[in-house]
Amino acid sequence: MELNQIIKSGEKMAVHPIDYRYGTPEMRKVWEEENKLEKMLKVEAALAKAQAELGLIPKEAAEEINKKASTKYVKLERVKEIEKQTKHDVVAMIRALAEVCEGNAGEYIHFGATSNDIVDTANSLLIKESIEIIEDKLKQLRDILLDKAEEHKYTVCVGRTHGQHAIPTTYGMRFALWAAEIDRHLERLKEAKKRICVSMITGAVGTMAAMGEKGLEVHKRVAEILGLEPVLISNQVIQRDRHAEFVFLLALIAQTLNKIGVTVRSMQRTEIGELEEEFDPTKQTGSSTMPHKRNPITFEQICGLSRVIKSLCIAEMDNIPLWEERDLTNSSAERCIFAEVCVLTDHILTLAIKGVKKLKVNKENVERNLELTKGLIMAERIMIELAKRGMGRQTAHEIVRQCAMKAYEEKRHLKDILLENEEVMKYITKEELEELMNPKTYIGLAPQIVDEVIKTLKNKKY
C-alpha cells in the first residue's frame, strides 16, 4: 500500500517520535502540512496584492486570489493529487489555487516569482510563529528561575569545581545564573529576528528580471504586507547563513537546558541528594525491576534531546554552500531540520518549565554536605584572613594548604589541625577560628548579586 493510500484510508503511521511522543500541540500545529500550505498561499496572496497595487496585474484578479488563497478553499488533499503528476509541490499548490479562482484570476498567480520566493518566505512565517512560542516559554522559565532564586537566596550550599567541593555558595546564585543565561537567549532572538524573519520575491536567480522595473517595489511591499524584513540581496534562495543562525540559537537554548539538567541530575545522585525532581510515589514507577527507584527522567529527557537539537546545526550549516545560485540539496534536509529543531526545542522548554517549577531542594542534605569535607571548604577564608592580619598571602596559602592536606589524609576536621598550628594561632584566636569556620557566613555578596539579577531581569522589556 502506498503512503498516500495509507493516509487517505486514515490508518495511522507514526514513525518519528515527534509525531507521538515529543512536542506540544501548539508547536506541532505550526509545522503541520496544513499550516505550511496556508503560509505558502498567504505569500502568493501578498504577492498578488502588491503587484495589483503597482499596476502589474489586474486589481480584480488580485482580489480573487486573496479571497481564495486559503486552505478553506485550497485543500491539502487536492495539492497532493496534483503533485503526484507534477512532482513539484509549489506548482501543485499554484494549480490547486488556480482551480478555485473564478474567471481568469488564476492566470496571474505567481507572476514573476520562483518557487523559493514562496517556500522560503513561507518558512520565514513559520519560523516567526515558532520564535514567538519559544520566546514566551523562555520568559516563563526565566521568571520561574527568578522566583526560585529569591526563595533560595540564603540557602547556603557547597560550591563545586572540577566535581570537588570548593567554597560555599547559595542555590539562589545557581538559579539566578540560569535565569540570566535564559534572558540572554531572549536578547539573542530579539536581535537576530531581523536577519532570520525575512522575505524574498526576487525571481529565478535574484535579479528580479521577470518582475521588470517595479521588482524592488514588489519585493519590499510583499515584506511589508507579511510583517517581514525584505532581504537586501539573494539568488534563488534566502541565504542559509540566516537559517543556520536560527538553528544554532535554538541549539544554544537547548544546551542551557542541558546544563540545568546536568546539574539537577548530578545533585539528585543518592549520595548527594540536594535536588529532586517531582515524583508521584502513589503511581509513578522508576524501574521495571527495582521498585525503589526515583529517577530524574524529566531532566534526562531534556539532556538527551538537547543532543539531537545540537546535531541539527551541522545539517543546516551544510546547507550554506549551495551550488552557484542554488541547488536542491537544502530542501529535503530542511523539511526535517526546521520542524524537528522547533518541535524539540519547544518540548524541552516545556519540560524545563514544569521540572524547575516543581524542583525540590532537600535542605537537610544540603546542610549535611556542607560539613562533608570536615571544614576544608573554609580553607580559602582562613588563608585570606591570615593575609589580612599580616601573614604574607603566599605564606598563608602554603601553611593552610599543608594543614588542609594533613586534615584530608588523617580524616580530621580542618579546625582541629589549624588549632594545632602555632603560626596560624599567632594571628587568630580559638573563638575567632570557630566563627571563621562557619560556611553560612562565607557567601560573599551572593544575596546582593541575586537581588541585582532579579531587579535587572524583571525590569527588562521585550
Curated annotation (Swiss-Prot):
Pfam families: ADSL_C, Lyase_1
Lyase found in the keyword field: yes
Record-given protein name: Adenylosuccinate lyase
PANTHER family: ADENYLOSUCCINATE LYASE (PTHR43172:SF1)
Chain residues that bind N(6)-(1,2-dicarboxyethyl)-AMP: 21-22, 87-89, 114-115, 236, 288, 293-295, 332-336
UniProt family annotation: Belongs to the lyase 1 family. Adenylosuccinate lyase subfamily.
Function: Catalyzes two reactions in de novo purine nucleotide biosynthesis. Catalyzes the breakdown of 5-aminoimidazole- (N-succinylocarboxamide) ribotide (SAICAR or 2-[5-amino-1-(5-phospho-beta-D-ribosyl)imidazole-4-carboxamido]succinate) to 5-aminoimidazole-4-carboxamide ribotide (AICAR or 5-amino-1-(5-phospho-beta-D-ribosyl)imidazole-4-carboxamide) and fumarate, and of adenylosuccinate (ADS or N(6)-(1,2-dicarboxyethyl)-AMP) to adenosine monophosphate (AMP) and fumarate.
Keywords carried by this UniProt record: Lyase, Purine biosynthesis
GO function terms (MF aspect): (S)-2-(5-amino-1-(5-phospho-D-ribosyl)imidazole-4-carboxamido) succinate lyase (fumarate-forming) activity; N6-(1,2-dicarboxyethyl)AMP AMP-lyase (fumarate-forming) activity
Database matches in InterPro entries: AdenyloSucc_lyase_C, Fumarase/histidase_N, Fumarate_lyase_CS, Fumarate_lyase_fam, Fumarate_lyase_N, L-Aspartase-like, Pur_lyase
Pathway assigned to this chain's UniProt record: Purine metabolism; AMP biosynthesis via de novo pathway; AMP from IMP: step 2/2; Purine metabolism; IMP biosynthesis via de novo pathway; 5-amino-1-(5-phospho-D-ribosyl)imidazole-4-carboxamide from 5-amino-1-(5-phospho-D-ribosyl)imidazole-4-carboxylate: step 2/2
Enzyme Commission number: 4.3.2.2
Lyase keyword on record: yes
Record's subunit section: Homotetramer. Residues from neighboring subunits contribute catalytic and substrate-binding residues to each active site.
Active site: residue positions: H162, S287
A GO BP annotation: 'de novo' AMP biosynthetic process
CC per GO annotation: cytosol
Catalytic activity: N(6)-(1,2-dicarboxyethyl)-AMP = fumarate + AMP; (2S)-2-[5-amino-1-(5-phospho-beta-D-ribosyl)imidazole-4-carboxamido]succinate = 5-amino-1-(5-phospho-beta-D-ribosyl)imidazole-4-carboxamide + fumarate
Signal sequence bounds: none
